[in-house]
Amino acid sequence: MYAIVRDRGMQYRVEEGQTLRIALLDAEPGSAIELGEVLLIGGEMPLVGAPTVDGAKVLATVLGEEKGDKIVVFRYKNKKRYRRRTGHRQEYTRVSIDKIVVGANEQHVTNTPEGETNGA
């Protein structure tokens, strides 16, 4: 099972056990976080939210912080001997996806193929 989650404007496809690099969070390594904006739960019976899936959340553990690759910004003005070279390294938080939780009603719907009942 996988999920599409949105975190501060970015969308990520996550699965249980996956490690992921997201924008910097103010969280200590080893702490548990919750990604609550679940847009889609995929699998045999996908569940699409409008815009989010009610009661669904992704539980993750913070592994640590890291920096991304350097982006070089070079500015110059033609024929004027004006040259400026600067760089930027974006900071990220590495998280491990522990569990994809679906609410009780949605779990009931996802396990039943269309046309069948769950005996309840």
UniProtKB/Swiss-Prot annotation:
Entry keyword set: Ribonucleoprotein, Ribosomal protein, RNA-binding, rRNA-binding
Any one Gene Ontology cellular component term annotated for this protein: ribosome
Gene Ontology annotations of biological process type: translation
InterPro entries membership: bL21-like, bL21-like_sf, Ribosomal_bL21, Ribosomal_bL21_CS
Keyword flag rRNA-binding: yes
Cleavable signal peptide: none
SUPFAM superfamilies reported in the protein's UniProt record: L21p-like
PROSITE patterns: RIBOSOMAL_L21
GO MF entries: rRNA binding; structural constituent of ribosome
A Pfam family this chain is assigned to: Ribosomal_L21p
UniProt subunit comment: Part of the 50S ribosomal subunit. Contacts protein L20.
Family: Belongs to the bacterial ribosomal protein bL21 family.
Biological role stated in the UniProt entry: This protein binds to 23S rRNA in the presence of protein L20.
Protein name per UniProt: Large ribosomal subunit protein bL21
